Every structure is written in C-alpha cells, then in structure tokens.
Amino acid sequence: MASEKKLSNPMRDIKVQKLVLNISVGESGDRLTRASKVLEQLSGQTPVFSKARYTVRSFGIRRNEKIACYVTVRGEKAMQLLESGLKVKEYELLRRNFSDTGCFGFGIQEHIDLGIKYDPSTGIYGMDFYVVLERPGYRVARRRRCKTRVGIQHRVTKDDAMKWFQVKYEGVILNKSQNITG
C-alpha cells in the first residue's frame, strides 16, 4: 500500500528541467560560427561559446580559444527538440548514457536528421543532447533564500531516469555489449 501511495504522489513525477544542445567543433573561426547558426536555427535562441580550458598542441588548441557552442532550452521547446532527437536515435539509448544523478545524454551525427533543410554553405554538424531531469521541489536547492538540499529519497536516480524514458517514450535501453548501427 505504501508503494502505491508513493507512485500516485504528484511530487514524485519526473519532468525535464532543461535540454542542452552542444556542438563541439574543436577550433574557432568560420566553422564555429556556422555551427552557432545551426543551433540558433534549431532552437530560436542565441548560442553561448565555450572556451578551451588549456592548450593542447597536438590538436592545435590554445587556452581560452572558443572551440564549441551550446544552447540551453527549457519548457515545451525542449520537449519538442528531445522528441526529434530521440526519433533520430529510434528511441534506443545505451545504459551508459544515463548518469547516477538521473541525467542522460546522447549524440547524433547529422543535424539535418532533425528536419532542418541542408544548406551547402553551412555544412553538416553532429551534436550532443544533454537532458537534466528533476522532480517538483528541486527549487529548494537553487533558490537564494533558505537554500537546502534535496532529500536522498526525492532525488532522481539512474533507475528512475531509465524507467521514465521507457514509460514516457516507450524507449529501449540497450546494454553496452550491443552495438547501435546508424
């Protein structure tokens, strides 16, 4: 009876807090600006540029050089983009795509699979999708006044996230040994 009561509690419902789309080009310049245009076209928001933390001579990357761009999407737009991204992956994710904190991420090879028309001047970019899940009440950890921690029982675990993915999207979770072709 206690477990049935726990499942019917609306505070236990899991929702998407945010979706982060990331394109890591590995160099600054024209390719990075074209990648930012792809993200802007996809999300309708202005992307933010990420800088290299340190110099890697073998890759030709200097410290503080802009090498990637990302955009954080929330709300209904995040759900639409997540749906289209999962459609490209055919609703199949690996078990290792899920973190212990209840987040998950995956990548796609070509942005044109999301429904954007191919533009020869832009090219084709792959991107990463990172999804952060939360329950109602997570605000207590983010607010400015009376900040406190989310209780261990209320946190989203890896198993919770995988179950949410399987129920909401009727997704398939594969083990590491199985290969995904595509």
Curated annotation (Swiss-Prot):
A GO BP term here is: translation
| Annotated GO CC locations | cytosol; cytosolic large ribosomal subunit; cytosolic ribosome; nucleus; plastid; vacuole
| Keyword line | Cytoplasm, Nucleus, Ribonucleoprotein, Ribosomal protein, RNA-binding, rRNA-binding
Q: Which family does it belong to?
A: Belongs to the universal ribosomal protein uL5 family.
Description of how the protein assembles with itself and partners: Component of the large ribosomal subunit.
- NCBIfam families according to UniProt: PRK04219.1
Protein name according to UniProt: Large ribosomal subunit protein uL5y/uL5x/uL5w
Gene assigned in the entry: RPL11B
